Amino acid sequence: MQKGLPEALIQTYESPHTLTEEEEKLFAENMKWADAAAIGCGMTVCESGRRMLALAAAQETLPLVIDADGLNILADEESLGKLLKDRNRQEKNVVLTPHMGELARLLHKPIAEVVAAEIESTIQAAKETGCIVAGKSARTCVCSFGEPLFL
């Protein structure tokens, strides 16, 4: 990615499971000056992932794209979901990009139920999170609650 998009900031960490105090400070500083952030890809569901997602979510004006393990953390952390919903009341600047399995975890529903009603499930996720949701399957359904749906 760095070669194809040299202006992208890539930050690596010593351990995938814990952040040192210095790494946490660096991450928080990077979030303050960033134009946008994508979080979740390559992360693991662990304390450092939870902390990074919380730090990014706390930057209210920072547009975020949350994918992969960022979504899995969000599904397990009610307080993070509330934080995102609250910040999106003013400005919708968080995009969630779940595939059907991640969408099922976000909604706490069986995957078969979500797959059988993928459009309705994507709309429900947008309503519950206050975020823009791009539900991915053979087609992609993009919606923000109360706004037109795009397929």
What are these regions (language model features)?
Residues 1-151:
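Glycine-rich phosphate/dinucleotide-binding loop and adjoining beta-alpha-beta core of small-molecule
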